[in-house]
Amino acid sequence: MQAAIMYGPNDIRVEDIEKPKCPPNGLILKVLSIGLCGSDIRNMTTDSCKGKYPHIFGHEIVGMVDEIDINTPKYKVGDKLYIYPEDHCLKCDECRTGHSENCLNPGDYIARQGGFADFVVVTNEQINRDAVFKLPENVNLDNATLSEPLSSVYACQENINITLGDSVVIIGAGPIGCFHAQMAKIRGAKCVIMVEINDKRLEMAK
């Protein structure tokens, strides 16, 4: 398979490598679509891995089950899945009350090889942590890669309870800022103000 492998800051090489083996009680996902997050750009242009190279980034992953362990009955070959990128347990009190950033049992997702490749491993731990979601057939796969950033926007607006008739000021008209603007309108905000120093981004937001 091919993968975009990071060997150091700004040193990304597309190479042919061996396809990973299916893990016990896990599966192999054929990557169908993947987002390019701002954190990916930051990570690939800095020493984010602290010298632990080579590494494959990419965490906004949608794919199709290519191989699956016989002991993983929840999914089947051909299923289209979205992989939640973080490694929160989603079971502790912090996670269940909407504060997964304070997870009491976090894993080390940054050490896992990512989705800038033809295939990616999905472990039994990820499945048990409810980090794998089956997609309905009618969902656009490119749009589905944005599930995690959009869920972050939703959680933010839930926390501050944006509702009908509110006025909302959003600082920054990048992708997340635009998500916030759209979400605020959906929630009934009467006035959405965006503050941005980049004219191109502001025009895009309009």
Predicted regions and their residues:
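Adenosine-nucleotide cofactor-binding segment
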Residues: 170, 185-206
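Glycine-rich beta-strand-centered segment in the early N-terminal region that forms part
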Residues: 20-34, 47-96, 136
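Surface-exposed amphipathic alpha-helices with a cationic face
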Residues: 158, 181-186
